[in-house]
């Protein structure tokens, strides 16, 4: 990936709905160059898809939390399967240190978040959890 690919990805991060022609114009590249690079980035998995990113107002309507989980050594496969089936779980990361998994949750209400936390805490293999409620997003550079 070179600087042109990086610029292309940054342009898509700003507006994933931009047409190939608009991208080419804004990056001062030929339309065919942009099309070829997009196809390559999709083929090699750099671009995994195009998705909706909620605006601040819509995102603020959901309550988010980071949940740190300690789990039993052999519990990960079954636990991850249960977490995948839990719609409030947006992300799950394995980690080093005291906690084995870091989850990001989102719920419509504090009651729904509380119920989700209780459900996850009761899953087989969870030995300890710690929840951190997000109050405000100060920096968001996610692409």
What is each PLM-predicted segment?
Residues 1-143:
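A compositional/biophysical signature of low hydrophobicity enriched in polar/charged and small residues
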């Amino acid at each position: 990936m070179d600087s042109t690919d990086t610029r292309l990805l940054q342009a898509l991060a700003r507006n994933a709905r931009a047409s190939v022609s608009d991208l080419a114009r804004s990056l001062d590249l030929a339309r065919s160059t942009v099309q070829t690079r997009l196809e390559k980035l999709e083929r090699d998995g750099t671009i995994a898809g195009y998705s909706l990113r909620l605006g601040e107002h819509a995102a603020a309507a959901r309550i988010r939390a980071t949940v740190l989980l300690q789990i039993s050594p052999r519990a990960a496969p079954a636990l991850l399967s249960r977490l995948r089936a839990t719609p409030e779980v947006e992300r799950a990361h394995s980690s080093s240190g005291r906690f084995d998994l870091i989850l990001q949750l989102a719920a419509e209400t504090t009651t729904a978040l509380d119920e989700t936390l209780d459900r996850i805490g009761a899953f087989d293999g969870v030995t300890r959890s710690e929840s951190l409620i997000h109050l405000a997003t100060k920096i968001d550079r996610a692409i």
